[in-house]
């Protein structure tokens, strides 16, 4: 394990990974133990997938793995499905309106898992399958940071969560301050909504253009 991880700055995994099989779960746990022993920052996207395992199975595994996590990404049903923490009532048309419940859920993660130093989430008000408002929120060092709200007409609603996570990690490893990190992450996420297929084929400059634009109504 060491030969694969010893030169890494961060280790990123999602809830999809240990759900694949018991062997993969054990491999992830082994990697996380190595990271903890060698001061490698661990970032976890809870990313619950009900077709892969039940909430009960997810909670047993993910609550155990959380002892190794430094930074947590939790969206929508992830809080309750993987950790048993209530933060979202299941209505995607009012996600942003539930921001106080999200904040409390994020705080509860840090209370139950004190090794987790920061938590971030994507909040959405979805009005139709294609039309919605999107924003990011980031809790770190005892303070919440919120991105602007972006109104988006989606071309394809696939991969936006992964785009958010990737851009969030990009911000962390490149030393962005917390506000810039969450603004960059949500900008990458909404940009992905205007691109077909899974891969967010954009540059940092593309994301900055969205991030620095005063126009928060996006469509392509």
Task: Give names to the regions the model predicted.
Residues 1-144, 150-151, 203-209, 218-220:
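Ribokinase/PfkB-type carbohydrate-kinase core domain
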Residues 144-213, 218:
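Conserved post-catalytic alpha-helical subdomain immediately downstream of the catalytic base
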């Amino acid at each position: 394990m060491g030969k694969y991880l010893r030169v890494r700055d961060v280790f990123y995994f999602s809830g999809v990974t240990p759900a694949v099989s018991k062997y993969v779960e054990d491999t992830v746990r082994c990697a996380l133990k190595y990271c903890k022993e060698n001061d490698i920052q661990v970032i976890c996207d809870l990313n619950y997938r009900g077709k892969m395992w039940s909430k009960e199975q997810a909670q047993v595994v993910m609550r155990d793995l959380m002892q190794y996590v430094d930074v947590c990404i939790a969206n929508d049903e992830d809080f309750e499905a993987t950790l048993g923490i209530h933060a979202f009532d299941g209505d995607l048309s009012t996600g942003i309106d539930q921001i106080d419940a999200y904040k409390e859920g994020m705080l509860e993660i840090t209370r139950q898992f004190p090794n987790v130093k920061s938590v971030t989430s994507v909040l959405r008000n979805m009005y139709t399958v294609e039309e919605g408002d999107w924003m990011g929120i980031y809790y770190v060092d005892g303070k919440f940071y919120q991105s602007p709200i972006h109104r988006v007409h989606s071309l394809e609603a696939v991969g936006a969560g992964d785009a958010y996570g990737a851009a969030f990690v990009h911000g962390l490893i490149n030393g962005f301050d917390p506000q810039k990190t969450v603004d960059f992450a949500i900008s990458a996420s909404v940009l992905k909504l205007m691109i077909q297929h899974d891969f967010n084929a954009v540059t940092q400059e593309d994301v900055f253009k969205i991030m620095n634009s005063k126009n928060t109504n996006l469509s392509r």
